[in-house]
Swiss-Prot record:
Belongs to the DNA polymerase type-C family. PolC subfamily. Keywords: Cytoplasm, DNA replication, DNA-directed DNA polymerase, Exonuclease, Hydrolase, Nuclease, Nucleotidyltransferase, Transferase. The gene is polC. This is DNA polymerase III PolC-type. The lineage of its organism: Bacteria, Bacillati, Bacillota, Bacilli, Lactobacillales. Its EC number is 2.7.7.7. Residues 596-752 form the Exonuclease domain.
Length: 1638
């Protein structure tokens, strides 16, 4: 038999010498417990003897290492002979103190100096005398004993025994320490006295010592006196000078907190008393403790507590009365002189003076300074533990590692995440509180933890939340669970916000270029934070200029109103020319007969102004043949950069003896005479040539220039990349040394003639050079070029609408990789706009570094103002080589300012901000780098493997002073003009605009005969009401309809109702039932016109024959469906039961003016048609999908941080990763559309009155356009229809088709159906067969694990109870910890607890509360506001409820609720559920066919068809996996539950049938269901439909034919064969060999 222990030893690589030793001779494995969920393996081993400690530790370490990739490990040891060696015993003892369960500093630091002694069968722990020993024994000794058991010592009992020798030794050591401390204090006293002098207001001169007040010590009868007397002449120590332990220290001070505590020793049973005080002197505060040794001392403890309590009550009373004279409030305070030893209290983790003498002192000294100390302690400033002095050294978090700290450290920083955790002990049930938060000092971040002791600490901890700045002290330890370093907190004190930047300038600038987090993957701040910062600095306005979009406008608008800041609405758009020419300086010449000079230049950088030519090379060609060459290097006058040489291959040796520039230029001009110039990306080469010609007094290029880049783009639009390398590769043209001008020029020439020949091949007949631009340039040529940035700002409301149009055109008509704005579109919609020159990608800046001053001047005329940034924002251009120095950059900015002044256009210094503060730069860095090198923003320097990211600029929000400093290279007047004066003047030119309207705008509808929506709703309402309830109507119905119609018509809501009615009617006409969501079922008008089936009237009977009406509005029935069946007393016809008692106020509010939100559940099959119905009703220009914005979520941001850490060689702790991820969230990543939301534009307006438009996720092939704004932003201003898809209507439609039963005829109180909610009887099955207690599996809303548990506990009996179940299961904090507890305790039953929101209003009205008050209470409760409203308001509601006998449990239940479900929504759900359940009970095979066709999402058709045993085995397999089961397995388990139920009821599954199976739906064959094709693994819906379509064309003669006609893969064919689907079918049809002959 295999020795498992030996196998384990081999696996963990235990050294052979140990494995063969006597220690392991008879060792064995008794048991191995594998905890799958927690990934823990627990080995239980047995040995002959207790192992030596070193062997035991090696065993545990090797096991842990060997299994580290699989699971955590634990080892428990037992020994057959428990011979205890005292040395080994103590070795294990010291080892135990290092284990996590016992390494608490308060315990291990004291007990590690003790030792164990064995006395016969007893084991004693030799300890010193310690008053806290009972506490330690009770808390830690059971753990210690359990550990020794796991070490192999068996059941041991460890008892403490006081070691007198040790006690004396410790006392002597302590005395030595105190003596040293007193010696040090001698030197301190002079310093203390000097500081006291300085603080004394009464001193006359620096050298005059304050007279010490005479204190009178009083006897016990006259005051407080414990222990020996304290001499009035003894030196008094200031509390602030205590830094460590000390002996014989005396304090004098005021007692401001006191507590008398008692505890009973577990061993002795003795009651111990301790007095705990907090005292203050004029320098600080301190904790004092005094153990009660005598009865008379203990008696005075309560006297002290009483005195201090009275003082604190006076302080509170004075402040309540509006007084805050803190010093006067201390007039009756208790003053003490105390003497004792200062020790570090491990339990409190602080220094405490343990007093041996206490004396009350009178008269009291001046208390002003002491009052300040107490006030600081009692102020709003948060403090946990001891004070941390300002002069204590603060450690940067980045410098802390696991091995760099020894002892406490102090951090200072910002809390960015925190929680107070309540932890319940599994063993004892005791609740402990753990404070956990994360903080950063922006060098790194740290986890901080503290176990809280006492209510005071818990209450303080609740205030430690994100946003707090604090100083903390504690010890750094590694937390294995968090896998990071954690500061174990001892002390915390709130500090003022650090590093706050202020705008101290008397006059403030206005920022005109600001990005929010709606600049896609490029900026960090929300619009709210941006505007709040501007307001904080006193800026009167700020401009929003996101990239290509306006999605931050609604938030900015709200923030502007809130903060009193004018919002200037703008955008940084992508400007393109309408058509990009192929030929510049075009003339009418024959392009096939002309001579061409194909040239290329190499330069030292990208700027024609600041970089130099180093090579000009050209090939002169005629009819495709080279006829001459030109190749000259040029000496720039300085050494070439490494980057230039790397890119071009040109070295200093190439250029050092080259000809002068002027000579080369004149020679080249002569070479080019009478030719057409050709270049690839000609604007670059021509720009450099013209700049150098101009500088050297030579004429610029005027002959035609052909750009082969644009030639290729227009000739081969299907290509994606048009670089010279890609093109030469495609056309097999040699390019040996790319980026050397001579080789590039020759390759470009050969490409030109390839293109000309292509034109000839296409028989275009074009010969003139003019025809290239006129006929070849595509209308879409703008799509391929790199756009130039331009900033657009709306000055007026008309301008804002034009801005909406421009952005819409860019996102819809001209979208190509990003939204583009053709210049013609901008010019056509320029009214009301200002146009700025934008950034370094703008054409003005581009011209300034690449063109002559005159050319730049001409380009700048298009703009209304010129923008310049601080030099730091152009950093990438300097690093990338466009500028050789900062001076060149500064000169360019001066040139731009000069251009502005020359043209009379204002120049504005703007910040191009992308984040708020300098420390936020890392967040943008992470976001931008996540895009990958070469992305639009993530520019690189170099190519291929040498490519490196260029640095991102310092793009924080700058104060006025910071901006002025950035432009300090200008004269002071100019700097002030562009930073302050011009920005303020321009801000004043803008109107106050409103991008989001205040009112609701609905379309106007006119029907046949001129009937308006208002007239139609009235007509339809009363037609149905009279049909159901007679004419005249009963008063209660007439009043209800009149009230509702008054609200609907008066607020313009009729069109909302009528649109919904029309959509429901159209879906009904197509054979589908429509379910309602939300509170629309609260409206009787909605019921009457057919929007919802839910009837909100009180439970009632009505007669369909004679309209008899009988109503129960006293609350005696929760639903009309629960009333007994009854015949009409007038005509004896069976009465219809209806009504759920739902107030109208829950839909449109108490005043009836809340915008109606009608959500409808259409069948998923019919939803697309319902969407198109809206477009059909209103027109394509007035119906849009509701837009959504997808932002970077926390998990995605976490991935970005980890990617950045990997790609850029960083290392972050987990807390720092949390911070960086949190800072990177919320940035716009994509756009989308609401799954069912349709926005309807009024037909008397257009969409640009409300929002720009775009395609969802920039998909230009999408069927619908969406609103550009997130639909929530315009929800209250425009009609939104929620046309949602749901499975329930699809199920009902399927069941109706199968059965012919009309859904409305199904009773809502069928007894068999109701029994499903109490057991399995209706199914004819037992609980054991089914595996669950109820029959609700597969019933909508009622078949989940959670809902079934709730049903089983709540025991619903009728429809009203099911409404409660629906409300309880959808609410938050309504069931768990609330209604559940009430039902369990018998205080209330299901019918009386709060289930749905409407129940509160109805219940309170029935109790007698006024309707308005009942409504208000309901609103406060349902929104979770009960505990957030002011206490006085809440108390008013509670009083009113108590006055009307509302039970206390009901009031308490209200206080716990966070969210509540509407009753109308619950009613609609339950009606659908009961209809489905009816088929499950009475037509089971139809039900299962529908359920598996529509609801099931995962299949294992092999198991399902294999019978009950196979199904149950598979269910057990998945269940045993627990949380390790995959999502697919979890979904499959749900399918198998219904499969098991179906099989148990006697039905079966057949196998897939090639000629009978459908694509997606099951087919009924007697008591058998034939599965559809999609139930096969790997066979999708499209292929399934193709098989069915091919089958309709004729029989499949072979598997090969099935593959071809059905589009089926070979893998699927093999699976079908294995499943027997293709039984008897040959692999190939022999006749097919001759198909080609027919």
């Amino acid at each position: 038999m295999e020795n498992l222990f030996e196998k384990l030893m081999e696996q963990i690589k235990m050294p052979p010498n140990l494995r063969r030793s006597s220690q392991f001779e008879h060792a064995d494995i008794e048991n191995v417990e594998v905890h799958t969920a927690s990934k823990l393996w627990h080995f239980q081993l047995i040995f002959d003897e207790i192992l030596p400690i070193d062997t035991y530790k090696l065993l545990t370490e090797l096991t842990e290492t060997a299994f580290s990739t699989i699971a955590r490990t634990e080892i428990s040891v037992s020994s057959r002979n428990q011979n205890i060696d005292e040395q080994n015993l103590n070795d294990y003892y010291q080892y135990a103190l290092t284990l996590p369960e016992l390494c608490d500093s308060a315990f291990s630091s004291i007990f590690k100096k003790y030792h164990l002694e064995k006395e016969e069968e007893k084991i004693h722990l030799m300890v010193e005398d310690n008053p806290q020993m009972d506490f330690f024994v009770e808390k830690y000794f059971p753990i210690l004993e359990e550990k020794f058991k796991s070490f192999g010592f068996g059941e041991v009992r460890i008892t403490p025994l006081v070691d007198q020798e040790l006690t004396e030794t410790q006392a002597a050591a302590h005395a030595e320490k105190v003596a040293a401390r007193l010696a040090a204090q001698t030197a301190e006293q002079a310093q203390i006295s000097e500081i006291k002098k300085q603080r004394s207001e009464e001193r006359e001169s620096k050298n005059t010592r304050e007279a010490k007040p005479e204190f009178v010590e009083t006897a016990l009868s006259d005051g407080i006196f414990f222990g020996r007397k304290i001499s009035g002449q003894s030196p008094i120590t200031s509390m602030s000078f205590i830094a460590g332990e000390g002996f014989g220290v005396i304090f004098e001070g005021l007692v401001f907190e006191a507590a008398h505590r008692e505890f009973t020793g577990k061993e002795s049973g003795k009651v111990n008393h301790i007095l705990e005080l907090k005292m203050a002197d004029e320098t600080s505060t301190f904790m004092i403790s005094k153990w009660g040794r005598k009865d008379e001392e203990i008696a005075q403890f309560d006297q002290i507590v009483s005195t201090v309590k009275a003082m604190n009550e006076k302080i509170i009373a004075d402040r309540t009365d509006g007084e805050d004279n803190f010093t006067d409030s201390l007039s009756d305070a208790l003053w003490l002189r105390v003497q004792g030893n200062i020790e570090h209290d491990k339990y409190k983790d602080d220094l405490v003076l343990t007093a041996n003498a206490v004396v009350e002192i009178k008269p009291k000294p001046t208390i002003d300074r002491v009052a300040l100390q107490i006030k600081a302690v009692k102020s709003d400033k948060i403090q946990l533990g001891r004070e941390i002095k300002n002069n204590e050294p603060v450690t940067p978090m980045r410098s802390v590692s696991e091995f760099s700290t020894n002892g406490p450290v102090v951090f200072e920083g910002y809390v960015f995440k925190g929680e107070l955790r309540e932890i319940k002990s599994r063993k004892t049930g005791n609740i402990s509180y753990l404070l956990e938060f994360e903080m950063t000092d922006y060098t790194s971040s740290f986890y901080v933890q503290k176990w809280l002791r006492g209510e005071e600490e818990i209450q303080l901890a609740k205030q430690i939340k994100a946003g707090l700045w604090c100083r903390v002290r504690g010890n750094v330890q590694r937390d294995n669970f968090k896998n990071d370093l954690v500061l174990q907190l001892t002390d915390l004190i709130e500090i003022p916000t650090q590093n706050v930047r202020e705008d101290k300038s008397d006059e403030k600038r206005v920022e005109f270029h600001a990005h929010t987090n709606m600049s896609q993957m490029d900026a960090i701040p929300s619009a709210s934070s941006l505007v709040a910062q501007a307001a904080k600095w006193g800026h009167k306005a700020i401009a929003i200029t996101d990239h290509g979009g306006l999605q931050s406008f609604p938030e900015a608008h709200s923030a502007g109103k809130k903060n009193g800041v004018k919002i200037i609405y703008g955008v940084e758009a992508n400007l393109v020319e309408d058509k990009i020419p192929i030929v510049y300086n075009e003339t009418d010449v024959d392009m096939y007969e002309s001579t061409y000079v194909v040239f290329d230049v190499e330069t030292t950088g990208l700027s024609a102004v600041h970089n130099d030519l180093i090579q000009i090379a050209a090939t002169k060609m005629h009819k495709g043949n080279p006829i001459d060459e030109f190749d000259e290097f040029i000496n720039p006058g300085y050494r070439l950069s490494e980057f230039t040489t790397e890119l071009t291959g040109i070295t200093d040796d190439h250029v050092k003896n080259a000809k002068p520039l002027y000579e080369v230029l004149t020679k080249f001009q002569k070479f080019c005479e009478g030719t057409i110039l050709v270049a690839h990306n000609a604007t670059f080469d021509v720009g450099f040539m013209n700049m150098n010609y101009s500088r050297n007094g030579l004429p610029i290029i005027t002959q035609p220039v052909v750009d082969t880049l644009e030639f290729a783009r227009n000739l081969y639009p299907e290509m994606k990349r048009f670089g010279l390398g890609q093109l030469t590769k495609k056309f097999q043209i040699g390019l040996e040394h790319h980026h050397m001008a001579n080789f590039d020029a020759e390759a470009t020439g050969r490409l030109l003639f390839v293109f000309l020949e292509e034109l000839r091949t296409r028989n275009t007949g074009w010969t003139s050079l003019l025809e290239l631009n006129d006929k070849l340039v595509s209308e879409d040529s703008y799509k391929k070029v790199r756009p130039k940035h331009v900033t657009l700002y709306a000055k007026t409301q008309e301008g804002l609408k034009n801005l909406f149009k421009i952005v819409s055109f860019g996102n819809v008509k001209y979208y190509a990789g990003l939204p583009r704005v053709p210049r013609s579109v901008l010019e056509a919609n320029r009214e009301g706009l200002l146009v700025g020159s934008a950034c370094e990608i703008g054409e003005v800046f581009d011209a300034a570094i690449n063109k002559t001053f005159e050319e730049t001047l001409e380009i700048a005329k298009f703009y209304d103002f010129i923008e310049v940034f601080p030099p730091a924002l152009y950093r990438s251009l300097v690093v990338g080589g466009s500028f050789k120095s900062e001076k060149e950059l500064e000169q360019t900015l001066k040139d731009l300012i000069k251009i502005g002044k020359t043209l009379g256009k204002p120049v504005l210094a703007t910040g191009n901000l992308h984040y708020l503060n300098p420390e936020d730069a890392i967040y943008r860095e992470i976001i931008v780098r996540s895009l990958g090198l070469g992305a639009e923003i993530n520019w690189t320097q170099g190519h291929g493997e040498h490519a490196k990211p260029l640095p991102l600029p310092e793009a924080h929000f700058r104060t006025t002073d910071e901006m002025l400093e950035a432009f300090s290279f200008l004269d002071e007047k100019t700097a002030r003009e562009i930073v302050i004066d011009n920005t303020q003047k321009m801000a004043d030119e803008f109107d106050v605009l409103t991008p989001v309207r205040d009112d609701l705008y609905t379309p106007k509808m006119v029907f046949d005969g001129g009937e308006t929506s208002e007239e139609r709703i009235v007509r339809l309402t009363y037609e149905k009401a009279h049909e159901w309830y007679g004419n005249p109507l009963p008063d209660i119905i007439d009043a209800r309809l009149e009230k509702e119609l008054r609200s609907i018509l008066g607020n313009g809501f009729s069109v909302v109702y009528i649109i919904s009615q029309e959509l429901v009617k159209r879906s009904n006409d197509r054979g589908y039932i429509v379910g309602s969501r939300g509170s629309v079922g609260s409206s009787l008008v909605a019921t009457m016109i057919g929007i919802t089936e839910v009837n909100p009237l009180a439970p009632h009977y009505r007669c369909p024959e004679c309209q008899y009406f009988e109503c129960y509005d006293d609350g005696s029935f929760g639903s009309g469906y629960d009333m007994p069946d009854k015949n009409c007393p007038k005509c004896d016809h069976k009465l219809i039961k209806d009504g759920h008692d739902i107030p109208f106020e829950t839909f449109l509010g108490f005043k009836g003016d809340k915008v109606p939100d009608i959500d409808l559940n259409f069948s998923g099959d019919d939803q697309p048609l319902a969407h198109l119905d809206v477009r059909d009703i209103f027109g394509e220009d007035y119906a849009f999908r509701a837009g959504t914005i997808g932002t970077v979520a926390e998990k995605t941001a976490f991935g970005f941080v980890k990617g950045y850490e990997r790609d850029y060689d960083q290392f972050y702790g987990n807390a720092e990763i949390d911070r960086l991820a949190a800072g990177s969230t919320g940035v716009k990543r994509t756009t989308g559309q609401h799954p069912g939301g349709i926005i309807v534009i009024p037909n008397y307006m257009d969409v640009y009155d409300f929002s720009p438009v775009q395609f969802p996720a920039d998909d230009v092939n999408a069927e619908w356009q969406t609103t550009h704004f997130d639909f929530h932003a315009i929800h209250d201003n425009i009609l939104k229809l929620d046309i949602l898809g749901h499975d329930d209507p699809t199920m009902i439609r399927k069941l109706q088709s199968l059965s012919g039963i009309v859904p409305q005829d199904i009773p809502m109180d069928d007894p068999g159906v109701m029994k499903l909610f109490t057991g399995t009887e209706s199914l004819g099955l037992t609980e054991e067969q089914l595996g669950v207690k109820l029959g609700t599996l597969g019933i909508p809303e009622m078949g989940t694990f959670t809902s079934m548990n709730m049903i089983a506990e709540a025991k619903p009996k009728n429809f009203a109870d099911l409404l409660q179940i629906s409300g309880l299961s959808h609410g938050t904090d309504v069931w768990s910890g609330n209604a559940q507890d009430l039902i369990r305790s018998g205080i209330a039953d299901l019918s009386s607890v709060i289930g749905c929101r409407d129940d509160i209003m109805v219940y309170l009205i029935h109790k007698g509360l006024e309707n308005g008050l009942a409504f208000t209470i309901m609103e406060r409760v349902r929104k979770g506001m009960w505990n957030k409203i002011p206490a006085e308001e809440r108390e008013k509601y509670v009083e009113a409820m108590r006055e009307h006998d509302v039970p206390e449990w009901y009031i308490e239940s209200c206080s716990k609720i966070k969210y509540m479900f509407p009753k109308a929504h619950a009613a609609a759900y339950i009606m659908m559920a009961l209809r489905v359940a009816y088929f499950k009970v009475h037509h089971p095979i139809l039900y299962y066919c529908a359920w598996f066709s529509i609801r099931a999402t995962a299949f294992d058709i092999g198991v399902m068809g294999a019978g009950l045993e196979a199904v149950k085995a598979k269910m057990k397999e998945i269940k045993d996996k627990g949380f390790d089961a995959t999502n697919v397995e979890t979904n499959l388990y749900t399918t198998l539950e219904l499969c098991n139920e179906m099989l148990e009821r006697g039905f079966t599954f057949g196998k897939i049938d090639l000629y009978r199976s459908e694509a997606t739906e099951f087919v009924i064959d007697g008591d058998t269901l034939i599965p559809p094709f999609v139930t096969m693994d790997g066979l999708g819906e499209n292929v399934a439909k193709q098989i069915v379509a091919a089958r309709a064309e004729g029989e499949f003669l072979s598997k090969m034919e099935l593959r071809k006609r059905g589009g089926v893969s070979q893998t699927i064919i093999e699976n079908m064969t294995n499943m027997g689907v293709l039984e008897g079918m040959p692999d190939d049809n022999q006749l097919s060999l001759f198909d080609d002959f027919f």
